[in-house]
Amino acid sequence: MADFRIEKDSMGEVKVPKEAYYSAQTQRAFENFPISGIRFNSAFISALGYVKFVAAKVNEELGLLKKPVSEAIQRASKEIIENKFDGDFVLDIFQTGSGTSSNMNANEVIAKRANELKSGTDIVIHPNDHVNFGQSSNDVIPTAIRIAAVISVEKDLIPSLRHLQKTLLEKGKEYKDVVKTGRTHLMDAMPITIEQEFSGYARQIELGVERIESSLFRMLELPQGGTAVGTGINTHSEFGKRFAATISKETGYSFIEAKNHFEAQATVDAPVELSGQLKTVAVSLMKIGNDFRWMNSGPNSGIGEVELMALQPGSSIMPGKVNPVIEESLTMVCAQVIGNDATITIGGQSGNFELNVMLPVVAFNLLQSIEILSNASRNFADRSVQGLIVRKERIESMVGKNPILVTALNPLIGYDKAAKIAKTAFSENRSVLDVAREMTDLSESELENALNPINMTKGGFSE
């Protein structure tokens, strides 16, 4: 028995795998683009399902699709939304720049499944004439990008980042009374508490969420209804507005029709903006992850201020070695997101006249950035921050010998004399307090008050 069937399109006959739900145009694209094996993720496929579901519903309401046809398309599209047919979305992301191949992939899968599900009609549901009615790849794909990104950010990324922010604040509060050596240029500086340092990390994440939320407002404008070039040719004049209202009801997010369809289809400025904010979050996480690696370094020959969770052996040759694997995973994710942003930026420049022609690569990289940032942020919170232990005794011993503590004496004895004390303390491996007793006329109480590390974390002048 043959393992393929014959399908026809406007260009002729094509052999298609027998069990596949896609048809001729998808098969042609599959053969044309054997590039990377990278396919769209489930979020994008689900978004295509939403577009087709809502389009069928709205076109029925407008009297443009018969009810049995619309209902069958809606039922099939629901299964796409639920990712039941992800295996039939077989196309490489490096394909036609409009994403037409992936739009037709959705149209063909939904048409075949709708014909299986239909009742009350003898009409053969067609990928173009029914599933794609009143639509073009040029508004479907940009719309799907926005829907997928908004849902993924709201459902996954923002909750993960807020969880990380909360975890950082809680860990800082757990060690709020621990004073450590601050560092600038990787060199000893004035003291800071663990809580203060971790509050800075948490604020980075909080601001990242705010930046992302701000950029989402532009992502809520949907190109759907513009069809081929933004004029709305071959669709109802109310389609775009009704589509936005219906998709909002279906998803729970406040989508609106694009204020200008020519901008919405000719550019991907909104996705480029969102990617830029994702890059900023990646930069923040890279800094935090690297700080954790430095604080954990050693444990004997490095800074060794904290002890991260021992999750797996770190070396195939050195027994007992444990590495900061979660931080390394996190920082690699950050590097990928930063690289994705560069790709998206180049993609955004490829909007020639009325259409961007790098939509698939923009879609893939944007959604990958959202996905891996979501997963890495939560993993970092749960498998690193929560289990972090501060090595109090080591921190206290290092703070006591920090020559930069002498900075607190500047208002009392002047910069030059304070510098001499710092140099002596460092060269003789003594505490600043011990040297200051010999080199100043300050009383013991004055010195102890001025050189108390906890007092230095509260700002102001020494008294």
Q: Which functions belong to the PLM regions below?
A:
Residues 1-463:
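Conserved, well-structured ligand/cofactor-binding cores
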